[in-house]
A protein has these predicted regions:
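Aromatic-lined, polymer-binding surfaces characteristic
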Residues: 49, 58, 67-70, 75, ...
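Mature N-terminal segment immediately following signal peptide/propeptide cleavage
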Residues: 28-49, 55
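Extended, solvent-exposed functional surface patches
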Residues: 24-26, 43, 53, 59, ...
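Active-site nucleophile-His-acid catalytic modules used for acyl/amide transfer and hydrolysis
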Residues: 63
Length: 215
């Protein structure tokens, strides 16, 4: 949380020249967390945001999640309308929509858990974030779980939990998240590599590949 910054682009503005991949990788912090905040600033950020309304809203949302444990997908998803459809394409579309409702909801819940942990260092939030995410990861073979957006959300959540909750995760838990990141990241890379040149207007390239893989 910082003040609003503003700047002007005029004739004197330097032309942006993107650095090489090697330069970017060399400047990555070697410690975690490093996405939402850097480890060296962690305690200072906690202190500065003790009374921040936005910070408090994440903690409040995270606390509410404890009251609503995540069930398995078969118990969470609403299929009452899906079973009435006879067209397989309509059924699949309906399942994707219903599945996304659950995954999108949990993405917001897990984001709140990760941020609450970073704002407090209370291990309960990190543990609950991983617990919910590991349940969602187990859904990938379910007939009720479909669509690239669900997979890309899992990729994003896995990255956030791995980085944000790194200190709390066990070796086995880190391995699960890294394998999930590698599996889904590889899938999207293979699907979209060199695709940008063919269809620059394909938003999935930006939403699923560049944004998340750059995390």
């Amino acid at each position: 949380w910082s003040p609003v910054y503003h700047f002007y682009v005029d004739d004197k503005t330097l032309v942006f020249n993107p650095p090489s991949l090697e330069e970017v990788l060399n400047k990555f912090p070697s410690t975690h967390p490093r996405i939402l905040l850097e480890r060296k600033d962690w305690d200072n950020i906690i202190e500065r945001n003790k009374d921040n309304p936005e910070a408090k809203s994440y903690i409040t949302k995270a606390n509410k999640c404890f009251q609503h444990p995540l069930k398995h997908l078969e118990e969470e998803i609403d299929t009452t309308q899906v079973v009435k459809l006879t067209n397989i394409v309509q059924q699949r579309s309906a399942l994707i929509r219903e599945g996304r409702k659950i995954v999108d909801r949990e993405e917001a819940n897990i984001e709140a858990m990760v941020r609450a942990y970073l704002l407090t260092k209370d291990a309960r939030y990190a543990q609950e974030a991983f617990k919910r995410l590991s349940e969602i990861i187990s859904w990938k073979s379910s007939k009720y779980f479909a669509g690239d957006f669900n997979l890309s959300t899992i990729l994003s959540m896995s990255t956030s939990v791995y980085d944000g909750c790194y200190d709390i995760l066990t070796t086995e838990e880190k391995s699960l998240l890294l394998n999930t990141i590698q599996e889904n990241g590889h899938k999207f890379y293979e699907e979209y590599v060199n695709h940008l040149e063919n269809r620059i207007a394909d938003n999935h390239v930006w939403q699923m590949t560049f944004r998340i893989l750059n995390m």
